[in-house]
Amino acid sequence: MDKIEFTIRRAQANDYEAVSRIYSGRAVWGTLQLPIPSADMWRKRLAEPPEGAFSLLACVENEVIGHLGLFTLPNNPRRRHVGQIGMAVRDDWQGKGVGTALMQAAVDLADKWLNLRRLELEVYIDNGPAFRLYEKFGFTIEGTLVDYAFRDGHYVDTYMMARPRK
């Protein structure tokens, strides 16, 4: 099988429908995102991102197949060095390297351009594929957040993971 080449680019306001489709997929139910978001919510979020927010897209040709948000804390003097990550990959592209490409782009942006010393994220403890992806990029578990989120009718635990840059 040939290696798939992904293009990583910044999201634009007119990408809102494609991003909304990603977060409407069943795979998102395994993340901390609310399923079935409105396209209008994504239109507003991409048109007017908060200060310090970076929205990256993974594309094959011109098709958007993954999204990663990297959120910095520029107005918090004690946490300016921190970035928080959330991501999702379209259902039909799961397990094909999209998450790896997005994480590599986020780590490069954080390390080489934003001078962030710490990246953080939360992941459901039963989301093995995501957990292994984050470990591959140097993230480690810093704690378990008990009953952290409500999913599919139950409270579930998440891991708090971080990647401090040495």
Q: PLM features: what roles do these ranges have?
A:
Residues 13, 31-92, 103-105, 109, ...:
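Acetyl-CoA-dependent GNAT
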Residues 2, 154-166:
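Terminal substrate-recognition subdomain of acyl/acetyltransferases
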Residues 57, 69, 84-88, 97, ...:
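Conserved beta-strand segments that form the floor/walls of ligand-binding pockets within enzyme
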Residues 111-122:
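Conserved GNAT acetyl-CoA-binding A-motif
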Residues 21-35:
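Helix-loop element at the rim of GNAT/NAT acetyltransferase active sites that forms part
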Residues 120-123, 135, 140-156:
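Conserved catalytic-core motifs of GNAT/GCN5-like acyltransferases
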Residues 95-109, 131-136:
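Conserved acetyl-CoA-binding loop-helix of GNAT-fold acetyltransferases
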Residues 6-21:
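A short beta-loop-alpha structural element at the N-terminal edge
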